[in-house]
Amino acid sequence: MFRCGGLAGAFKQKLVPLVRTVYVQRPKQRNRLPGNLFQQWRVPLELQMARQMASSGSSGGKMDNSVLVLIVGLSTIGAGAYAYKTIKEDQKRYNERVMGLGLSPEEKQRRAIASATEGGSVPQIRAPSHVPFLLIGGGTAAFAAARSIRARDPGARVLIVSEDPELPYMRPPLSKELWFSDDPNVTKTLQFRQWNGKERSIYFQPPSFYVSAQDLPNIENGGVAVLTGKKVVHLDVRGNMVKLNDGSQITFEKCLIATGGTPRSLSAIDRAGAEVKSRTTLFRKIGDFRALEKISREVKSITVIGGGFLGSELACALGRKSQASGIEVIQLFPEKGNMGKILPQYLSNWTMEKVKREGVKVMPNAIVQSVGVSGGRLLIKLKDGRKVETDHIVTAVGLEPNVELAKTGGLEIDSDFGGFRVNAELQARSNIWVAGDAACFYDIKLGRRRVEHHDHAVVSGRLAGENMTGAAKPYWHQSMFWSDLGPDVGYEAIGLVDSSLPTVGVFAKATAQDNPKSATEQSGTGIRSESETESEASEITIPPSAPAVPQVPVEGEDYGKGVIFYLRDKVVVGIVLWNVFNRMPIARKIIKDGEQHEDLNEVAKLFNIHED
């Protein structure tokens, strides 16, 4: 009895300041509880009855009083523990609020998601049972469609269902500007400084732009809601219904599929063991950028496999970083030069030399045969017998369109290009549209295509949104794409750009203003498609006073700036503007006209490449 009383007394001494509102002190009574340890508590009726029985002289005497003390003691401990827990939780919430002061909305969103997913617990946000506009996928195409729908129908209710835990964001800075940031917290803030010095977030909009998915059906003026971390696993086209991976169902009136793609791997890596796979990055998302940035500070060697846009951009970014860190950066690919599938051979070779000057060890004509582990390092064996030792691998060898919904939805997959096969209005069915990387569409000028670029996601998403609200417009606006190999070399392209096509290139000497940095300063944005997409050239005329255009340079010359025309049946179907910026409307008009040109040197005058 006295041990119990002593324990309770100890708790009382520590908890009295915390629980003053829990009990009241009564006047002193003659018949106090044994041990004289407690003030009298307000207790439940059952305990009051027990106390009355103990003090009435009923049989049991000391034993009954002992039981009462035990019961009251346990009640004291429980009440004290509850009060202590409540106060600690209040203090924790207060500290979290203080810690959150000064954080950007994007960082608050990221921390909230990270906190919610710790230990596998995900907050259960109830999806609405019905929405007028359902967008599957949370990338650029879906966001462009949502904005387009709301522009044409200001009261529209739009729900985006995204497997990605992040809100919609732009991908180009993940392989470009973010790597050149001086901010040590760039992986947390995801803010980057453009070449013109302006700060920008990779998120299209802050969390405050979106409405709650649960509240979406009841909001008077509509809005855009995003369900993150959710995947649509079943599509019923006839029933206008989808099923999510959590079992919930959503019916819709109009649906857009913008599921994007998944980075391709290499068969040699797929065959390798778990350690090789754990030390390989398939670069695509914010999480991949964060992981690779951390890895680049911890290892001595990184090998980038892939010589296209993404591979070359990442290699240059890591190479420039290596000049300060000393990390070895290797890039290998099967083509003869960087971007060999896009650029004519002479320009591909010149570009490769430029990449080398960024601090990258470039290995062309390299086909990976196997990847293993030797002496704690990764060992890449090439088909020609060469071996490459490295600490980490980054694969950038293209995308595989996400078309799983074709099976349950009964949608057609294009056998040549992959992706959902849609018409010129981007329709797969009367109530289903597809946009972005996953759409294999019919281009009324260039034929059937599938494009994996940011601006195409913007253009196709916007068109799909317009058509979902009744526009019935075909795909005719040619999207563009761009690539920067650091701040000094960049190009913009449009149409069918394939090195297997005949090309004609016209070049001139570059000036100090002919680089991506200057282009950004002029346009005000590093996402150059934002300034070029809306522009149109209404009329093309060749100025009679334009200076004469020299002959095409030969191998080994310096290709400072120029225009490369890609031909099919003597018609220009693609154009690359090499260090020539803010001229995309002219290129777009040339492709749209689809005419044969006797002298492309004259056409090159339209781009004013000889102006200082």
UniProtKB/Swiss-Prot annotation:
Keywords: Acetylation, Apoptosis, Cytoplasm, DNA-binding, FAD, Flavoprotein, Isopeptide bond, Membrane, Mitochondrion, Mitochondrion inner membrane, NAD, Nucleus, Oxidoreductase, Phosphoprotein, Transit peptide, Ubl conjugation. It catalyses: A + NADH + H(+) = AH2 + NAD(+). Residues 133-482 are annotated as: FAD-dependent oxidoreductase. The modification Phosphothreonine is found at T520. Expressed in cortical neurons (at protein level). Residues 55-101 form a propeptide. FAD binds at residues 137-141, 163-164, 171, 176, 232, 284, 437, 453-454, 482. The keyword 4Fe-4S does not apply. The modification Phosphoserine is found at S115, S267, S370, S523, S529. GO terms for molecular function: DNA binding; electron-transferring-flavoprotein dehydrogenase activity; FAD binding; NAD(P)H oxidase H2O2-forming activity; NADH dehydrogenase activity; poly-ADP-D-ribose binding; protein dimerization activity. It is found in: Mitochondrion intermembrane space; Mitochondrion inner membrane; Cytoplasm; Nucleus. Residues 512-551 are annotated as: Disordered. Residues 1-54 form a transit peptide. Its cofactor is FAD. Its EC number is 1.6.99.-. Belongs to the FAD-dependent oxidoreductase family. Functions both as NADH oxidoreductase and as regulator of apoptosis. In response to apoptotic stimuli, it is released from the mitochondrion intermembrane space into the cytosol and to the nucleus, where it functions as a proapoptotic factor in a caspase-independent pathway. Release into the cytoplasm is mediated upon binding to poly-ADP-ribose chains. The soluble form (AIFsol) found in the nucleus induces 'parthanatos' i.e. caspase-independent fragmentation of chromosomal DNA. Binds to DNA in a sequence-independent manner. Monomer (oxidized form). Homodimer (reduced form). Upon reduction with NADH, undergoes dimerization and forms tight, long-lived FADH2-NAD charge transfer complexes (CTC) resistant to oxidation. Also dimerizes with isoform 3 preventing its release from mitochondria. Interacts with XIAP/BIRC4. Interacts (via N-terminus) with EIF3G (via C-terminus). Interacts with PRELID1. Interacts with CHCHD4; the interaction increases in presence of NADH. This is Apoptosis-inducing factor 1, mitochondrial. It comes from Mus musculus. The gene is Aifm1.
